[in-house]
Amino acid sequence: MNGDLGKTAITFGVFDLLHFGHFELFRRIRELVGESGKVYVMLQIDEMIAKYKPGCKSVYDFTTRQKMIETLRTVDKAIPYDVVGVEAVKDIGFDVLIVGPEHTNERFQRLFKWCAENGKEVVTLPRTEGISTTKLKEIIKDL
């Protein structure tokens, strides 16, 4: 799919404490869809982070995370979502779902099936080695 112009890609995440791994992900997605394509970031709302990741407190609230992501030239729009699934994406016009290797739970499996049934491509991109939000928070905590 490399450089397919005019395609729209989506990816899911919290994207708290933006770091090099996030920037690389967004850059790779932009590379895949081309400059005339669209990159939409499905950004999890605060209430669901607290529910699905107990004990994992966000540094930035949703509005701040959305503003930060939307200032990046590689991203066209950050869209709120509560839970990963068909309901979150069915009304969004997209061609490609971008996921990481860790996205294997049942919700993602149902979404992958829906994508296959609806002509949407699913692309798995590797994580950027050596960096993660969790690792960053641990480093900051130890300072």
Where are these regions (language model features)?
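Nucleotidyltransferase catalytic core that binds NTPs
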Residues: 1-143
